[in-house]
Structure formats: structure tokens, C-alpha cells
């Protein structure tokens, strides 16, 4: 029996500017569709944010980079009701950056997975989802969340993705992600 190959996140960083979340404000003249979009995605990214991260696959290390576009909408974080008492408020500055990069990577999964040639590097789609959860936890720790709480929140995100795997792809249809 061969050795099991392990996929591990090594590091993550915003390389130029950090995200600047801007609340999307509903106005009386907006259409019902625009108001529903704001209700679903109450924030948008106010800065163009380049990022990079490294992943170890077995013995190989791969670097990936991308850019979160200015104006990218996201819902901050869906924290199930029962888990809210042991996690941060979804609008907490500790959570916002991590949820942005996580939601961006998942919304672009099909494109990024192919652009970054992840399959050729031996990373499966399920491992890519797990990497996005690890990045979420990594950014939480970077922003000062204690290790155990960040780990726990990242595990919640991972479980949520496992049970509702298509959530983000079903909800981000109105924003042209290129």
C-alpha cells in the first residue's frame, strides 16, 4: 500500500492592499431584483486585492496568485444559528477578510481550478474546497482570532460546504465574475 498524499496550505497573504468591505445600501428607487441582491450580499469589496498562497502536495510546493476584483459582492459569513454563540459575529472585522477570500475562491472555483491547473498538480476539487476553508482559518488567525476558535470556525465552514456543496455557485449568478 502506497503512502497517502497530503495536501496542505503553507501560507496566504494579500500582496498589495487588504480588502475594504463596503456595505451595500438599499435605496427607494432600486428595483426589487437589486434589493434582493443587496439582501443576499450586503457587502462588496472596495479595493482590488491581489493575493497569493502556497500549497504542499506530497513533496511538491506550488504557489498560486489571483486578484479579488473591486465591487465583488459577498454575504460575509453564514453562521448557523446553533453555532453563533461560540463564534464571532459575522460582521466582526475578524471574520470579514477571511469570508471574502473564501467566498471569492469558491465563486470562481471552476475557473480558478482550471486556470491554476490544480488537477495536473494533483489537487482534487474536494481538496480545493478544504484549502479555501484553511485559508479562511489562516486569515482569522492573522487577524488575531485565537488558534482554537479560528480552527473551530474553519471546521464549521468545511462541514457546511460538505453538507451544502453548491451554495455559493447557486447564489452568485448576478455578478459577472469574468
Tell me the role of every PLM-derived stretch.
Residues 2-178:
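Extended terminal accessory/targeting regions
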Amino acid at each position: 500500500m502506497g503512502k497517502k498524499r497530503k495536501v496542505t496550505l503553507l501560507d496566504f497573504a494579500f500582496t498589495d492592499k487588504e480588502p475594504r468591505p463596503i456595505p451595500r445600501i438599499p435605496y427607494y428607487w432600486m428595483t426589487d431584483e437589486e434589493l434582493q441582491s443587496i439582501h443576499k450580499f450586503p457587502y462588496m469589496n472596495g479595493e482590488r486585492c491581489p493575493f497569493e498562497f502556497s500549497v504542499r502536495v506530497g513533496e511538491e510546493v506550488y504557489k498560486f496568485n489571483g486578484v479579488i476584483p473591486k465591487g465583488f459582492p459577498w454575504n460575509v459569513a453564514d453562521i448557523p444559528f446553533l453555532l453563533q454563540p461560540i463564534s464571532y459575529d459575522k460582521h466582526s472585522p475578524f471574520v470579514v477578510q477571511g469570508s471574502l477570500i473564501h467566498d471569492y475562491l469558491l465563486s470562481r472555483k471552476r475557473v480558478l481550478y482550471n486556470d491554476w491547473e490544480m488537477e495536473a498538480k494533483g489537487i482534487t476539487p474536494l481538496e480545493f474546497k478544504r484549502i479555501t476553508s484553511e485559508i479562511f482559518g489562516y486569515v482569522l488567525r492573522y487577524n488575531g482570532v485565537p488558534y482554537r476558535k479560528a480552527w473551530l470556525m474553519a471546521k464549521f465552514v468545511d462541514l457546511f460546504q460538505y453538507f451544502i456543496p453548491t451554495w455559493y455557485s447557486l447564489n452568485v449568478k448576478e455578478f459577472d465574475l469574468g
